Amino acid sequence: MQAATSRESYRIAGDRLDAYVRGAEPSAVAATADELLSVADLIRREPRLRRALADPARSGADRAALLTGILSGKVGADALDLSTTLVAGRWSAPSELLDGAERLGVAALLAAADKAGDLGEVEDELFRFGQVVAGQSALSNALSDPAAPVEQRATLAGELLTGKARPVTVRLVEVALGGFGGRSFVGALTRLVELAADRRDRQVAYVTVAAPLGEEEERRLGASLSAIYGREVSVKQSVDPEVLGGVSVRVGSDLYDGTVLRRLNETRNALAKR
């Protein structure tokens, strides 16, 4: 968890991003997002720069000037403004600055999809791609292999997604392949799905069933969960025949396991203790 000073610095940059997004076209926001992510990549690649940009002994203006000297002429005015706003804040550790830079780029991508009216679809495409990867061990290994260059894995993902997913989705998958927030590829995809849902003011419910829920069943389940959590719920289904029946629902750290498999396991455990 980030320290309070880092959270406040990110909040200030996030507010500036929101103000920019309100007056910009979706395509412009997407282009700015890509530049913000390139800045995050630079901060990741250059540990000395990362330390300098988070150095509490330097003033915010000095840190912003340092980054301006590096980025001038290489990114647009909006990306430069947002990046310098970010580094001008106080950061408790260089790693937290990197995390903030990555999140700002992702937030801009999601904002671009939101302005274009595509955010719900992007959320679903990210989840479905994660399901495809999880269902194919060879593909999962290829995309998660830390020994393979990110560019190589991104090319593979791009070949799979081109023509089947929106450009913002493809770019977010690339972010996940880069280990967004220090996570594994699968963990990063999951977090991106949750961030997309959160921008739509929704909570994600991961539902595991033996056979797909019908549209009306899914709607009723979503409505019930919304009543419990006090906000709209985005239901994400995974089909696993091994659960045999019933339903398992995970929302955040809450798990509701009503599967037949769980009940059978409980029965076996009870019998084994006799």
From Swiss-Prot:
It is found in: Cell membrane. GO terms for molecular function: proton-transporting ATP synthase activity, rotational mechanism. One of its GO terms (cellular component) is plasma membrane. Gene3D superfamilies: N-terminal domain of the delta subunit of the F1F0-ATP synthase. It is a peripheral membrane protein. Keywords: ATP synthesis, Cell membrane, CF(1), Hydrogen ion transport, Ion transport, Membrane, Transport. Disulfide bonds: none annotated. InterPro entries: ATP_synth_OSCP/delta_N_sf, ATPase_OSCP/dsu. F-type ATPases have 2 components, F(1) - the catalytic core - and F(0) - the membrane proton channel. F(1) has five subunits: alpha(3), beta(3), gamma(1), delta(1), epsilon(1). F(0) has three main subunits: a(1), b(2) and c(10-14). The alpha and beta chains form an alternating ring which encloses part of the gamma chain. F(1) is attached to F(0) by a central stalk formed by the gamma and epsilon chains, while a peripheral stalk is formed by the delta and b chains. NCBIfam families: PRK13430.1. F(1)F(0) ATP synthase produces ATP from ADP in the presence of a proton or sodium gradient. F-type ATPases consist of two structural domains, F(1) containing the extramembraneous catalytic core and F(0) containing the membrane proton channel, linked together by a central stalk and a peripheral stalk. During catalysis, ATP synthesis in the catalytic domain of F(1) is coupled via a rotary mechanism of the central stalk subunits to proton translocation. Belongs to the ATPase delta chain family. This is ATP synthase subunit delta. The lineage of its organism: Bacteria, Bacillati, Actinomycetota, Actinomycetes, Micromonosporales. The gene is atpH.
